Amino acid sequence: MGKRKSRAKPAPTKRMDKLDTIFSCPFCNHGSSVECIIDMKHLIGKAACRICEESFSTTITALTEAIDIYSEWIDECERVNTAEDDVVQEEEEEVEEEEEEEEEEDDEDDHVSVKRKYNF
């Protein structure tokens, strides 16, 4: 008589670590000062700094976690900063182009005056 086939033990389930709900502020860089609040009743997520009182709110879904709200805030800050940098860079380029045009006009004026000297 043979042995019965033994069953393998089920693999142990891994515990999921809880995600952070308190983060550092992107404005004042104070560690653990931003707290994320999720209002499922109104589907609004809010991240607010207790130190500098900056805040950000966004619409949420049933799957949204605190880290998602904070990540959206950081992404929005980066998007605004790059947009401002682009505007400043465009303004600087326009000023440089205007200066170059003025220099070219000055150079043309110099050439005209030299020609007038020889025309007499």
Curated annotation (Swiss-Prot):
Residues 84-120 are annotated as: Disordered. One of its GO terms (cellular component) is nucleus. Zn(2+) binds at C25, C28, C49, C52. Its main location: nucleus. Keywords: Metal-binding, Nucleus, Transcription, Transcription regulation, Zinc, Zinc-finger. Residues 84-110 have a biased composition (Acidic residues). It comes from the Eukaryota. One of its GO terms (molecular function) is zinc ion binding. Pfam families: Zn_ribbon_Elf1. It is found in: Nucleus. Transcription elongation factor implicated in the maintenance of proper chromatin structure in actively transcribed regions. Belongs to the ELOF1 family. This is Transcription elongation factor 1 homolog. It comes from Arabidopsis thaliana (Mouse-ear cress).
